[in-house]
From Swiss-Prot:
Keyword Protease: yes
Protein keywords: Hydrolase, Metal-binding, Metalloprotease, Protease, Zinc
Species of origin: Shewanella baltica (strain OS185)
Pfam family, one: UPF0758_N
Name of the protein described by the UniProt record: UPF0758 protein Shew185_0376
Chain positions recorded as Zn(2+) binding sites: 173, 175, 186
Domain of life where this protein originates: Bacteria
Amino acid sequence: MGIKDWPEGEGPRDKLLQKGAGQLSDAELLAVLLRNGLAGLNAVDLARSLISEFGGLRNLLCAPRNQVCRLPGVGPVKYAQLQAAAELARRVAQENLQRGQVLTNPDLTRDYLMRQLADRSYEVFAVLLLDSQHRVIQFVELFRGTIDSASVYPREVVSLVLEKKAAAVIVCHNHPSGNAEPSQADRRITERLKNALATIDVSLLDHMVVGDREIVSFAERGWIN
């Protein structure tokens, strides 16, 4: 059954229009995007089955195309709709942290980094470049793949900082496993970066590790002095 076939006022789309998107469950929101179910399953049932199959929305949205499209009721069109919605969410977060904005709200930074990195199926190491008044200059993804003390090169971070004339930086990376607890390698990387940036009088304000539903801040733990 498709969304258009629901009795008037009972479908997830009608509920969204009447009560707002915040009142819909994950499955109902996903159903609005999917629009149609398949034989024996309406759109909400299909959405529930997809969320269950992948263990949550995050895993569904970052799953490879071949894994998603192999399931009944989900073809290339529905996959494209889901990816478009995920990318729109990331771009909204990007707009919320525009160039020139002063970082006075830690929650804004956390929300931005969560949206940028939490749904990646691979590790990303990135740098948030700030000026002397802690205004945003740029967010740059520097390294992808397995992030350890041997794969992050301080000289490349220093080169980027000099190029963009940044006065302070926040570095961050994600853990695709979902567990945001920093490793010993993460702590070694941080120490190396802090020392390298100190040689050009640039402050390392924080290193944030992004997990599935949380972010660990080195600064909050007192690991950056």
